[in-house]
From Swiss-Prot:
One term under GO cellular component: cytoplasm
GO biological process: carbohydrate metabolic process; glucosamine catabolic process; N-acetylglucosamine catabolic process; N-acetylneuraminate catabolic process
EC number(s) reported in the record: 3.5.99.6
The UniProt record lists the keyword Iron: no
Region forming the signal peptide: none
Gene3D superfamilies hit by this protein: 3.40.50.1360
Native source species: Pseudarthrobacter chlorophenolicus (strain ATCC 700700 / DSM 12829 / CIP 107037 / JCM 12360 / KCTC 9906 / NCIMB 13794 / A6)
Protein name: Glucosamine-6-phosphate deaminase
Matching SUPFAM superfamilies: NagB/RpiA/CoA transferase-like
GO molecular function list: glucosamine-6-phosphate deaminase activity; identical protein binding
Pathway noted in the entry: Amino-sugar metabolism; N-acetylneuraminate degradation; D-fructose 6-phosphate from N-acetylneuraminate: step 5/5
Cross-referenced PROSITE patterns: GLC_GALNAC_ISOMERASE
Catalysed reaction, written as an equation: alpha-D-glucosamine 6-phosphate + H2O = beta-D-fructose 6-phosphate + NH4(+)
Amino acid sequence: MEVVILGGSRPIGKLAADAIEELLRRKPDAVLGLATGSSPLPVYEELAARHATGLDFSRASGFALDEYVGLPDGHPEQYRNVIRREFTDRINIEPANVHSPDGAATDIPAACDAYEAAIAAAGGVDLQLLGVGTDGHIGFNEPGSSFASRTRIKSLIEQTRKDNARFFTSLADVPHHVITQGLGTIMDARHVILIATGAQKAQAVRDFVEGPVAAICPASVLQFHPHATVLVDEAAASALKLADFYRHTYDNKPSWQGI
């Protein structure tokens, strides 16, 4: 796991976009793992700007990390619609190549299996973007999730529903269930970039980067990933014991190495 401490959301977005641009130039049909929430927004902004100056997404594909269960088609908070609004409608990726779990399916387990099969048929995810919750969750893999888990239905804990209520008219409108890629699914991605900003994420960052690998902190499984990059601002890095080491390592790595 590489930890990179940067000065704010803009340099974080630029560095993550650098990795995605390099991937697309090397592999134009790359498979991107797309997250929602505030963490990836600077990346999407930067990629949209680069597309405007020529970065090509026409052969790429994308897979959303998760989706609410039970929201009607067209609901603005369906994650498939959020991803379109915030990113894919701003680039030239083919709409048919952007996939998300079917939260409106009548047979949810079958929809989960179909999503796993679609990821596998695409050749797997080349680069997965992630955020992290204050309790260490990634995707909607809440504390206690199995490290071997695959795409499945999950119940949202009340704190997560409260955190997401700002996107809905009221807490009562926030769904109780989601479909999420599992921790095992996420770990299959060839490169994972996790973004965390703000002091409210500092304890979670310390727990999953420097704490024990434990189900109480789902993101800690990334310690076992062969190519995980953690991009944090100074506030999110404020609880890290080894912050100076991470700064020294990044400042002195060869320029050709990338992230």
